[in-house]
Amino acid sequence: MAVPKRKMSRSNTRHRRSQWKAAVPTLVACERCHEPKLQHIACPACGTYNKRQVLEV
């Protein structure tokens, strides 16, 4: 197993950790009602996915 040769400073540790963050989810407009929705997920406003009604809203 690899072992660090030198102690890593707080500054370097925090600088490295600052790059590790969650990405903002991509929103697209629904083709039917034009409400913002997540990609590859049924629209929560009108219940359609891929031009088909899949949820009863």
UniProtKB/Swiss-Prot annotation:
<keyword id="KW-0689">Ribosomal protein</keyword>
<comment type="similarity">
    <text>Belongs to the bacterial ribosomal protein bL32 family.</text>
</comment>
<dbReference type="GO" id="GO:0003735">
    <property type="term" value="F:structural constituent of ribosome"/>
</dbReference>
<protein>
    <recommendedName>
        <fullName>Large ribosomal subunit protein bL32A</fullName>
    </recommendedName>
</protein>
<dbReference type="InterPro" id="IPR011332">
    <property type="entry name" value="Ribosomal_zn-bd"/>
</dbReference>
<dbReference type="GO" id="GO:0015934">
    <property type="term" value="C:large ribosomal subunit"/>
</dbReference>
<dbReference type="Pfam" id="PF01783">
    <property type="entry name" value="Ribosomal_L32p"/>
</dbReference>
<dbReference type="InterPro" id="IPR002677">
    <property type="entry name" value="Ribosomal_bL32"/>
</dbReference>
<keyword id="KW-0687">Ribonucleoprotein</keyword>
<dbReference type="InterPro" id="IPR044957">
    <property type="entry name" value="Ribosomal_bL32_bact"/>
</dbReference>
<dbReference type="GO" id="GO:0006412">
    <property type="term" value="P:translation"/>
</dbReference>
